């Protein structure tokens, strides 16, 4: 088939705001390919195994470059369509594979979705505060400049247990409502 590279595309919920560009993470079992890629989030992230990992490892063993591009979707919108992630993935695919990826209606859909999310967030002060905190978190990580994406310190992200404890404390402090 003349295949010269295998690229898997996916997305995952992340502690990022919808008000910033979608960050892409890259996964690969090839050290050389990892060293050659610039502009992607670097770091170690433990995730459940999946078919993409098997394809990546086997393709690299066969001498075929393989990687996965993963869009970081704001966790608070991860259950709804998020065209900005699809757009970022297409742009990332075009970048790593050296192809022209047709974007179609995605840019307009992403803009319309952004407006709708802005409206929803504006209706709730707690949501506004959360988005502001996420903006600060992401902006601190990106402060080193646009030359290459930063290494995000995943140790600074609260664990599931810490988030659950914080949520329980928040709920305890709320006045009882009938």
Task: List PLM regions with ranges.
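Accessory terminal and edge-of-domain segments that mediate assembly/interaction
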Residues: 1-5, 13-178
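Acidic-aromatic/histidine active-site loop/patch
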Residues: 10
């Amino acid at each position: 088939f003349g295949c010269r590279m295998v690229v898997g595309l996916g997305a995952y919920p992340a502690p990022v705001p919808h008000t910033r560009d979608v960050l892409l993470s890259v996964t690969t079992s090839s050290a050389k390919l990892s060293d050659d890629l610039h502009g992607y989030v670097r770091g170690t992230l433990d995730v459940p195994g999946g078919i993409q990992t098997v394809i990546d490892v086997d393709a690299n063993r066969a001498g075929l470059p393989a990687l996965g591009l993963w869009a970081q979707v704001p966790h608070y919108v991860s259950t709804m369509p998020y065209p900005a992630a699809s757009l970022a993935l297409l742009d990332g695919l075009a970048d790593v594979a050296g192809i022209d990826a047709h974007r179609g209606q995605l840019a307009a859909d992403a803009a319309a979705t952004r407006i709708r999310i802005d409206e929803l967030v504006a209706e709730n002060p707690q949501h506004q505060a959360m988005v502001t905190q996420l903006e600060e978190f992401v902006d601190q990580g990106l402060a080193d400049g646009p030359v290459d994406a930063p290494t995000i310190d995943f140790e600074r992200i609260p664990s599931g247990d810490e988030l659950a404890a914080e949520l329980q404390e928040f709920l305890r402090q709320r006045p009882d409502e009938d």
